[in-house]
């Protein structure tokens, strides 16, 4: 079964305040093993970035002002995720931002009930009363966080893949395939690569 592990970074916490997506990553997997197909973009959010958000992911408008706008990448994004289940941690947050961007362009929104698996919901059902942030789940499952000095959508997709495997009781993927390095043009430009055996390069 094909899935897409998806993560975004944004200019702030809520679309209601006009905040927008500035980074999006989608990693295709087959039975949770990466296929080497990746969609990754840094995006000009067309607005300033809140100081709190910038502290989390490290991006500023100055860094992103010459990147593509969401309108420029929307079709490629929609084509990439078409007919795939999306695995997202705290899905309502990411989907609210994605659907806000799609609505701006009069494009069909993502149906969160039909097309999305929320790993946070699964974690809350398995570990009620615990903090189930991505960081805390990585610690719980002994997943290496040493490279996560800032939030990064591409790296976080790989961390989420490993967390999700543990949540659903699958075999550790590093035993099933050799390390493979994923790059996209934006990732290469920013010096970002993710070794899908769990190391970021």
Q: Could you say what each language-model-derived stretch is?
A:
Residues 166-185:
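Acidic two-metal-ion nuclease catalytic site recognized across multiple nuclease folds
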């Amino acid at each position: 079964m094909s899935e897409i592990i998806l993560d975004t970074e944004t200019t702030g916490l809520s679309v209601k305040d006009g905040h927008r997506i500035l980074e999006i990553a989608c990693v295709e997997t087959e039975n949770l093993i990466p296929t080497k197909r990746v969609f990754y973009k840094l995006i000009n959010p067309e607005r300033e970035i809140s100081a709190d958000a910038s502290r989390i992911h490290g991006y500023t408008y100055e860094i992103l002002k010459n990147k593509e706008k969401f309108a420029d990448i929307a079709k490629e994004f929609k084509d990439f995720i078409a007919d795939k289940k999306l695995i997202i941690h705290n899905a309502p947050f990411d989907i609210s931002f994605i659907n806000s961007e799609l609505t701006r362009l009069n494009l069909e929104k993502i149906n969160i009930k039909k097309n999305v698996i929320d790993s946070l919901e699964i974690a809350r059902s398995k570990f009620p009363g615990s903090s189930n942030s991505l960081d805390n789940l990585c610690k719980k499952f002994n997943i290496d966080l040493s490279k996560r000095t800032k939030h990064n959508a591409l790296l976080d997709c790989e961390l989420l893949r490993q967390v999700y495997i543990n949540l659903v009781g699958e075999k550790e993927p590093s035993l099933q395939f050799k390390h493979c390095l994923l790059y996209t043009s934006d990732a290469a430009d920013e010096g970002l690569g993710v070794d899908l055996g769990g190391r970021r390069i």
